[in-house]
């Protein structure tokens, strides 16, 4: 469907009704990044290669980063469990003394180690993580980790409609 920029702007404003004029671009970029991740997972599943999808939702807990919300790449310190090393060169957005941070860092890094070791990411303390399929299952990493089916449905359907 062809749309003028004016009509697309109206649709975006209606969809992101909670966004301020200054933050709508951030929401659009976040959604587009998520859409690409979902598209890659979908294509991998369709081609038989398979894959897993996760979303990192744990908001930063340091005073200077609390206002960011869960940002792109903030999970990297969890991936490499950088919280145990006070001299880490990693950018850290979370309080290394927080028990939730410590626990998630151990479980997430352990999950990735298990995946590299065996080809299966399960067994390191997180919920049973299914391969991406028609249910669009996604591991949500947060204070409490869980599996959600199609957690970005509203956004996915909107971006499919406007493309």
Predicted region positions:
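Tryptophan-rich aromatic "cage" segments
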Residues: 144-163
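Generic hydrophobic, helix-prone segments enriched in Leu/Val/Ile
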Residues: 1-2, 101, 158-163
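Substrate-gating cap/lid region and adjacent catalytic-acid/histidine neighborhood
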Residues: 1-99, 111, 118
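Non-catalytic, well-ordered alpha-helical segments in soluble enzyme domains
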Residues: 101-124
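A structural signal for short secondary-structure junctions
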Residues: 71, 106, 131-133
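Polar, surface-exposed loop/tail segments
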Residues: 57-59, 119-144
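Short, charged low-complexity intrinsically disordered segments located at boundaries
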Residues: 41, 69-74, 138-150
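Short capping/connector residues at structural and topological boundaries
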Residues: 81, 85, 134, 144-146
């Amino acid at each position: 469907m062809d749309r003028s920029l004016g009509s697309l702007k109206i649709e975006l404003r209606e969809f992101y009704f909670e966004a301020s004029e200054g933050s709508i671009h951030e929401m659009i970029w976040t959604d587009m990044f998520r859409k690409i991740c979902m598209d890659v997972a979908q294509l991998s599943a369709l081609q038989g290669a398979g894959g897993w999808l996760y979303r990192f939702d744990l908001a930063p807990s340091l005073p200077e980063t609390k206002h960011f919300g869960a940002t792109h790449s903030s999970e990297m310190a969890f991936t490499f469990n950088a919280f145990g090393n006070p001299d880490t060169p990693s950018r850290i957005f979370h309080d290394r003394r927080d028990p939730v941070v410590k626990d998630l860092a151990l479980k997430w890094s352990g999950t990735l180690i298990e995946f590299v070791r065996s080809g299966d990411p399960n067994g390191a303390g997180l919920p049973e993580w299914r391969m991406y399929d028609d249910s669009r299952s996604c591991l949500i990493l947060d204070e409490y980790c869980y599996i959600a089916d199609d957690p970005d449905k509203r956004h996915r359907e909107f971006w499919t409609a406007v493309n």
